[in-house]
């Protein structure tokens, strides 16, 4: 939309084609009569509680950085839904909330078991937290967005923490045709079979198995080719 037409009321909008830099192309203008314009842009997650808790935030999404179990940088605090990153559909939020709840419950059960096994049981929150999560203390794998990939959720992976690692991402601008490729060093661990169009308004999803991550050491990179 390059112009809204009307004085006291909306009468029409002018739309234009854009180039690869999202700049309107002169001569492509088209007038579409209408009486209402709805805008849903620039949504930002609300994370005052996250900041107060000392949780590390992703500067791109403005939401918490999480691992593949949706656990934040603060042990025992999990994040999901639009507080984590803006979603396309409520169904996506619901599924992510179910996943976060499952992982949080597993964490709580592990904490309880660790405390029961400890001869010196403590009711101190910080001491209790230190006893949790030991079974998930694998080396973390960084998830790095490259090229047209603007961000990823999660930003880090504990390979053995979940049976399947769900990687979600958005592109920074429209890409007419490309494939998703995920690499570890020189090795391609995932590449989509078919090329397709990518747009920033649609969240993309890739599932990686534990077998695909088995030989990864430090990081994986997510890009389009």
Give, region by region, the residue ranges found by the protein language model.
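Hydrophobic residues embedded in beta-strands of well-ordered beta-sheets
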Residues: 9-11, 64, 77, 220
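Alpha-helical scaffold segments in soluble metabolic enzymes
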Residues: 3, 12, 36, 48-52, ...
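A Rossmann-like FAD-binding core segment of flavoenzymes
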Residues: 1-48, 163-170, 174-181, 185-194
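Rossmann-like nucleotide/phosphate-binding core characteristic of flavoprotein oxidoreductases
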Residues: 105-225
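FAD-site-proximal beta/loop scaffold in flavoenzymes
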Residues: 35-87, 128
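A conserved FAD-binding loop/helix module that cradles the flavin
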Residues: 80-111, 135-143
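Generic secondary-structure signature for well-ordered alpha-helical cores
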Residues: 6, 18, 39, 43, ...
């Amino acid at each position: 939309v390059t112009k809204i037409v009307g004085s006291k009321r909306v009468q029409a909008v002018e739309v234009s084609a854009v180039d690869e830099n999202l700049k309107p192309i002169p001569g492509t203008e088209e007038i579409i009569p209408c009486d209402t314009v709805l805008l849903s842009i620039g949504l930002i997650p609300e994370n005052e509680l996250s900041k107060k808790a000392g949780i590390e935030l992703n500067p791109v999404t403005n939401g918490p950085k999480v691992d593949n179990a949706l656990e934040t940088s603060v042990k025992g605090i999990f994040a999901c839904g639009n507080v984590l990153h803006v979603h396309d559909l409520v169904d996506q939020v619901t599924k992510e909330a179910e996943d976060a709840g499952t992982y949080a419950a597993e964490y709580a059960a592990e904490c309880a078991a660790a405390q029961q096994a400890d001869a010196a049981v403590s009711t101190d929150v910080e001491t209790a937290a230190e006893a949790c999560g030991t079974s998930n203390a694998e080396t973390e794998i960084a998830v790095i967005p490259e090229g047209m990939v603007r961000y990823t959720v999660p930003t880090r992976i504990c390979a053995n923490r979940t049976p399947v690692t769900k990687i979600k991402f958005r592109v920074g601008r429209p890409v007419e045709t490309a494939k998703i490729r995920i690499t570890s060093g020189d090795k391609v661990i995932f590449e989509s079979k078919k090329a397709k169009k990518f747009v920033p308004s649609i969240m993309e999803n890739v599932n990686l198995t534990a077998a695909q991550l088995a030989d990864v050491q430090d990081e994986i990179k997510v890009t389009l080719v």
